[in-house]
């Protein structure tokens, strides 16, 4: 009888031990699968060359003002107020004689005495200031509100364009003529640069002025 009890006990112990080992293996396997399935978010660190389209004689050194770098030459965004408050945008206002006015040959579209040019490449807000000025003597990053309907009709569905509207140090929206601008869909308190798209009936604000977008340049049409 004792031998029978011992045999039964051993059988029960062996079964329990086997079940324990199997359960432990399943637990370890589940933990491994869980770790493999977890997606850990990462932060993309953009290098200077990814942001600044102009390297030589970059009057508004947007990258230096807007970013600080670590030892690996990576960059981290800082508030746009540093950029807006540290630059004189009047340098990029239009100031040209009648003979320098834009012509239909350099414009993408013309409207009531205005030329508009849509850039193909994408730049930061500061990059668009430089691009428009370098494209033609009397072109500048323009405020398109006077011709918003016509301008938007020529914008692709997937594209957005920087326009010449930004926050002044007084925290009001202005254009390159230093004229007060109303009608900006100001969703965010800490937004400093404006852009438009096919579906924006009014200019929209952007907190990150370094976002690559196309440029809307403009100027006065010559006679």
From Swiss-Prot:
InterPro entries: C-type_lectin-like, C-type_lectin-like/link_sf, CTDL_fold
SUPFAM superfamilies: C-type lectin-like (SSF56436)
Molecular function GO labels: carbohydrate binding
Signal peptide boundaries: 1-31
Keyword line: Disulfide bond, Lectin, Signal
Disulfide bonds: 193-209
Keyword Disulfide bond: yes
The keyword Acetylation appears for this protein: no
Residues of the C-type lectin domain: 111-218
This protein's name: Putative C-type lectin protein 51
Gene this chain is encoded by: 51
């Amino acid at each position: 009888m004792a031998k029978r009890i011992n045999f039964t006990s051993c059988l029960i112990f062996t079964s329990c031990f086997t079940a324990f080992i199997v359960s432990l293996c399943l637990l370890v396997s589940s933990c491994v699968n869980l770790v493999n399935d977890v997606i850990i978010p990462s932060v993309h660190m953009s290098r200077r060359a990814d942001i600044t389209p102009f390297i030589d004689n970059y009057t508004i050194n947007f990258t230096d003002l807007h970013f600080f770098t670590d030892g690996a030459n990576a960059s981290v965004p800082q508030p746009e107020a540093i950029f807006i408050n540290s630059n004189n945008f009047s340098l990029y206002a239009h100031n040209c004689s009648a003979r320098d006015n834009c012509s239909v040959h350099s414009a993408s579209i013309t409207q009531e005495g205005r030329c508009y040019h849509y850039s193909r490449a994408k730049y930061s807000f500061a990059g668009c200031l430089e691009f428009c000025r370098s494209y033609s003597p009397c072109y500048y990053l323009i405020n398109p509100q006077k011709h918003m309907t016509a301008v938007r009709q020529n914008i692709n569905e997937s594209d957005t364009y920087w326009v010449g509207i930004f926050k002044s140090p007084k925290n009001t929206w202005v254009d390159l003529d230093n004229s007060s601008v109303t009608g900006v869909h100001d969703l965010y308190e800490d937004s400093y640069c404006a852009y438009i798209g096919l579906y924006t009936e009014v200019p929209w604000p952007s907190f990150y002025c370094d976002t690559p977008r196309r440029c809307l340049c403009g100027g006065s049409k010559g006679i």
